[in-house]
Amino acid sequence: MAFLNPILHLALDTHIKTILRGFGQVMLQNNALTGLMFLIGIFYNSWQMGLGAILGNIIGAVSAVLLRYPRDDIKNGLYGFNGTLVGIAVCFYFGINILTISAIIVGAFLSTYAMHIMKKRLPAFTAPFVISAWVVILGIKLLYPASAMALPLPQDGSLNLFSAVSMGFGQVMFQGNIITGLIFFAAILVNSRNAAIFALYGSLLGGLFSLLLPLPVAIINIGFFGYNGVLCGAVLGNKKSDAFLLTTLAIILSVLLYFGFYKAGITALTAPFVLATWIALSIKSIR
């Protein structure tokens, strides 16, 4: 049976890379090393959210296999990253227990199905995560009103731009940690210098522009108004002047949309990024 060892090794290597790419694709980076660094960054800040990320990723990918979705899409992590975000979000809001594990399984499956439907019609980005997470979070709150964890509120203070920009990267995956944010930036840089530069621009511009809005500075410092800009920059960023202007527009629009969600008391997740990017791409298509 020794001849099977190379085959088993190759199969295991393929599956591991698929899962790691699923982490990388959270910020649209099809790179296993980037994904590994993202996972390390999550665990550095929270082992619970790290476990949630792994569970959501695996369930998302396995669901795609069972539903017989395109193999190349599965290998490239396209059916893992939305599940990853669902797993992190559920653990962020409710911790990890039997209830939330069940919710992650349901939410990750829904995100995979939504991804398959949406990608046929438009760039889905993280929209399947947003839809699935809204459904799961609402369901948990309705069934178990006392289950939500009490999240620490930031204290007011002066602007800390370094914190705002770094946490802008971290908050893409609910990580309010400066070191995790730096790891995330380095992870993007490993795969694409262009994406890293424009993601940095997105976090910086998002944080600075939000100063014009009636907001507590402490909320800006923890990256809440930068993380959607990180994603806009990573997706749309380009050195050409027209692309740069479009990227800038999307980043500013994502801040305004997040502000609208914030004032309305709605959990925004990455919806501002998705909506702003769809609008920017629509403008680009009619020019």
Task: For each feature predicted by the language model, list its residue ranges.
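N-terminal signal-anchor module of multipass membrane proteins
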Residues: 1-69, 167-175, 179-191, 207-211, ...
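Structural signature of hydrophobic alpha-helical transmembrane segments
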Residues: 43-55, 94-106, 165-177, 215-226
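Membrane-helix interface "capping/anchor" motifs
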Residues: 46-49, 66-78, 95-101, 115-125, ...
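Transmembrane alpha-helical segments of multi-pass membrane transport proteins and ion-pumping complexes
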Residues: 49, 53, 57-69, 87-88, ...
